[in-house]
């Protein structure tokens, strides 16, 4: 079994910085490439943001993040007790629309899947 790192935070947007810092420091300790680590920080930030905004909807709750590495695989678990949703219910964003014209949000699930 590889090394394991755990973090638990309250489901508040102001805790996203701590989550990103945790992913970065855990990844660095585990020898993850900096470019890959930057992508992982963005993806985990998007996932936790979705949990906070759409899962807990402002209610109290916790988000637990675990980072493990076993052989060649890095695994990140995000655990919560929020309301569930199906990612298949989320529309694919209009990528041809410029960032200036695009509505705020709506990219999280796309980034996570891709």
Task: Enumerate the language-model features and the residues they cover.
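Helix-loop-beta hinge of the Bergerat
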Residues: 2-34
């Amino acid at each position: 079994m590889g090394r394991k790192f755990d973090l638990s935070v309250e489901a508040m947007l102001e805790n996203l910085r701590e989550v990103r810092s945790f992913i970065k420091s855990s990844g660095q300790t585990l020898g993850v490439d900096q470019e890959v680590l930057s992508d992982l920080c963005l993806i985990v930030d998007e996932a936790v943001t979705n949990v906070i905004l759409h899962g807990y909807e402002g209610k109290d709750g916790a988000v637990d993040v675990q980072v493990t590495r076993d052989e060649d695989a890095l695994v990140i678990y995000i655990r919560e007790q929020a309301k569930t949703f199906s990612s298949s219910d989320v529309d694919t964003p209009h990528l041809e629309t410029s960032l200036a014209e695009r509505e705020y949000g709506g990219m999280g699930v796309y980034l996570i899947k891709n």
